[in-house]
Design a protein with these regions (language model features):
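Extended, folded cores of ATP/NTP-driven motor/assembly subunits in large transport
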Residues: 1-186
Length: 187
């Protein structure tokens, strides 16, 4: 059966535990474990067009998901008026820090100045800034959940990301994974 049929039925029972949600039905053998992950750290450079590489590698079996998965990206366009003042303040602060004597011992000051300069330039030409998230959900039999988790970690680590298990936040993560659920109330 498809995952949508297992989750949507009203008689599906969700049992939360630290690693994820166990989905099952009374009187039916077998269960499904859903585990959810957020991104803990991003690579320094990674364009959205490269996201296709996060669904696995066709040529390397070790970098192929061993269970059904759901990869979701949520994008929230930030208020341009509010962001203009925030970006301006942070850009001024980054410029001051880059010109200070402490800049020599703080290597990330130059990178922060570049980031805030790019954000300020984008706002100056009428662009908007966004806040986004990625959510990964893996659906597997409980006995294969650890293996599926390790495979997902290997795929994402190979692209420079570090995944973070959403421990004790499974239902929120499930809602964040579903399409068309991102709204003001959920953001």
């Amino acid at each position: 059966r498809e995952i949508r049929d297992q989750i949507v039925d009203f008689d599906t029972i969700q049992d939360p535990h630290p690693a994820g949600l166990t989905l099952w039905k009374e009187g039916h053998e077998g269960s499904l474990e859903a585990r959810f992950y957020s991104i803990k750290s991003f690579p320094e450079r990674f364009a959205l067009w490269q996201m296709g590489s996060l669904i696995g590698d066709l040529m390397q079996p070790a970098l192929q998901y061993s269970a059904p998965f759901l990869l979701t990206m949520g994008v929230h366009v930030l208020d341009p008026n509010v962001m203009k003042s925030v970006v301006t303040a942070n850009h001024v602060r980054a410029t001051q820090n880059a010109r200070s004597k402490m800049a020599e011992v703080m290597p990330d000051v130059g990178k922060k100045l570049q980031d805030w300069t790019a954000a300020a330039n984008a706002i100056d030409v009428g662009s908007s800034l966004v806040s986004l998230y990625h959510q990964l959900a893996i659906f597997s039999p409980p006995e294969k959940a650890v293996s599926a988790q390790e495979t997902a970690n290997a795929i994402w680590r190979g692209r420079g990301f570090q995944l973070n298990a959403d421990v004790y936040m499974h239902r929120q993560a499930l809602l964040a994974s579903l399409p068309m659920t991102l709204s003001e109330a959920f953001y």
